[in-house]
Amino acid sequence: SSESDKTDTKTAKDETVYVLANADGSVKKIIVSDWIKNGLNEKSLKDKTDLQDVKNVKGDESYVMDTDNMRVWNADGADIYYQGTISKELPVDLKVSYKLDGKTVSADEIAGKSGKATIRFDYTNKQYSEVNIGGKTEKIYVPFAMLTGLMLDNDVFSNVSVTNGKIINDGDRTIVAGFALPGLQENLNLSKDKFEIPDYIEVTADVKNFALTTTLTLATNSLFNEFDTSKLNSADDLQAQLNELTSGMTKLIDGSSELYN
């Protein structure tokens, strides 16, 4: 995921979080890359971060710690690009589960097997605030859109389908991208019987000697900038707003698919 922290009109920090995960979705390591944009060509830049093992990844600028526990970079007019690690909880939890011929199996158990496979990505939004609504405490979740992409070898995977997503087949491989909106169902206090907003992605396929290489997941909340809940007066209004979100995710999926070509 990526976010910008603007300190003034000429200086900003872009932060991208990379999560290296195990086959079940559990976190192996979190790497954070920061870019401090030195629009004012300052000689030094102050920066506050919780990262550990911070290192400059694009130059030889160094830093010192000041009395406020801030890093003061000797920028000499340049932008600063650095990287570090962190162990804090992620705002969205990802769980990856597998089935083979309808039976739940582990990642190790499905490896090398053949049959009807299902790969399911479940997302749990953990970032929320508690607010009082009508005398009752409610959880209001920070909205996140999740995009997961897979590149599947057509010698292994065939007859691929996905819920809440798109499939592109170039002959040698199948690119799958799906999206989910965890926490939005709860924010809107909407019954799944009336309207279900996806909080998971499920990929099914016939497999031969199952082997899954890299999967990529992107989390973003920028798509919700135009999502106005005050305009939701009917199911049609909700459908229109969700259609806009879906359109935005489709564009993101199309853009992500281009990266594989």
Q: Where on the chain are the PLM-derived regions?
A:
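Cytosol-facing boundaries of transmembrane alpha helices in integral membrane proteins
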Residues: S1-Y260
